[in-house]
Amino acid sequence: MRFSQATVLAFAALSLAAPAFEADNKNIKREDCDKTSFHGHHKHKRAVAYDYAYVTVTVDGNGNPITTVSPVLSIETIAKSEETSSTSTSISSTTTIVQNDSLTSDEPKTLSLPSGTIKPSSFATESQSQSQSSSTGGSGSGSTNGIEGDLAAFEDPTEEFEDGVLSCSDFPSGQGVIPLDHLGFGGWSGIENSDGSTGGNCKEGSYCSYACQSGMSKTQWPEDQPSNGVSIGGLLCKNGKLYKSSTRSNYLCEWGVKKANVVNKLSETVAICRTDYPGTENMVIPTVVGGGSTSVITVVDQSTYYTWRGGATSAQYYVNNAGVSWEDGCVWGTPGSGVGNWAPLNFGAGYANGIAYLSLIPNPNNRDSLNFKVKIVGESGSTVSGSCSYANGKFNGNSDDGCTVGVTSGEADFVLYN
């Protein structure tokens, strides 16, 4: 039995978004995100967005599926029997994994935050509250090497976050947490307020989401999520102080699975923007890869990461054209801007049952081609099943439907090249 690739794409249209003000003369518009808005999620829900489900199944040597997959929506299945130049592999058991995009198919009118479910370990005394704990890294003005973060690749954080110490007006930089000051939220990646609005400052009753350096994910989201499908993530502002919203970790950031990197063979920098999920679903979390450089990229362990309505979720990324800065590219874009949710290409990355699934995904918002090519290749000594490449708006030569590989051992690279 040979492991091959079958990709299922399910598209469900979402609602439109209105632009705010223009940031510069490059047809890039930046949203007025520091103001609150009564909207189901981020007030600038991505225009004409889709829900993706990528399913990889085991097939026999003739490309016939061994398992039966029951998709939820109208689907198109593309089954291919391919091998990459790296070592081929045989898999003795059936492998089925769904990689869901972070979007929901409905946009609720109001944001329903969970109540009565946050159980911080204890409230700090007044004297404790007045002291800055070194474990939090202080406010957004602390030294964190900017969006690069303060940890070396796969260096674990060492200082735990303490409930009830930092004020809600402070941002917990450091230990993997990076500030996104350009968004206007005081360093936070997004704010979900108790009155159903999003944006503004981290204030009483709000869930304040944060970004982690590339290769890491935030650990904090309440177990009790709204029944309307909206996702909630981040720290809780309670009695003027910040508290963890989950007991799953005492650290705010955790590393993904060491399975993928981005190798930039171009001369220009490329900004790759992860959706803030669970949370406001902004595509604002940057992985920035300079020309001639390499960066780790987050591959989430789907057995331990956030689940949406019982289903596993993967990391999803928007890939901007080379030369677009991360400040301009990792935002909610507008039609014709070609940035943010209008960037031409998506990456997907998840890990389950010993296999990392890495995907190149078309963005139906923008069918224009990137100004560079992408291929997923196994590193030396790695085992990768399937092949996946993108050039001139097409996948694996002439397909419009994206592609996925399975990394069963070692690591693979998203290679960016001319």
From Swiss-Prot:
Compartments where found: Secreted, Cell wall; Secreted
Residue segments, region Disordered: 81-150
EC number: 3.2.1.-
First-level EC class: hydrolase
Low complexity: bias regions: 81-97, 127-136
Alphabetized UniProt keyword annotations: Carbohydrate metabolism, Cell wall, Cell wall biogenesis/degradation, Glycoprotein, Glycosidase, Hydrolase, Polysaccharide degradation, Secreted, Signal, Virulence
Keyword Glycoprotein: yes
KO phenotype (gene knockout): Leads to increased cell size, cytokinesis defects, altered sensitivity to the cell wall-modifying substance Congo red, defects in adhesion, and reduced biofilm formation.
Post-translational modification as stated in the protein's UniProt record: Predicted to be a substrate for cleavage by KEX2.
A molecular function (GO) term: glucan endo-1,3-beta-D-glucosidase activity
One Pfam family this sequence matches: SUN
GO cellular component: a single term: cell surface
Signals that turn on the gene: Strongly up-regulated under hypoxic conditions and in white but not opaque cells. Repressed by exposure to caspofungin. Expression is probably regulated by EFG1 since SUN41 has 9 E-boxes in its promoter.
GO terms, biological process: adhesion of symbiont to host; filamentous growth; filamentous growth of a population of unicellular organisms in response to biotic stimulus; fungal-type cell wall organization; polysaccharide catabolic process; septum digestion after cytokinesis; single-species biofilm formation in or on host organism; single-species biofilm formation on inanimate substrate
InterPro entries noted in UniProt: Beta-Glucosidase_SUN, SUN
Residues of this chain annotated as glycosylated in UniProt: N100
Signal sequence region: 1-23
Compositional bias annotation for Polar residues: 112-126
Activity profile over pH: Optimum pH is 5.5.
Annotated function: Cell surface beta-glucosidase involved in cytokinesis, cell wall biogenesis, adhesion to host tissue, and biofilm formation; thus playing an important role in the host-pathogen interaction. Has hydrolytic activity on linear (1->3)-beta-D-glucans such as laminaribiose and other laminarioligosaccharides.
Entry's family note: Belongs to the SUN family.
UniProt protein name: Secreted beta-glucosidase SUN41
Organism of origin: Candida albicans (strain SC5314 / ATCC MYA-2876)
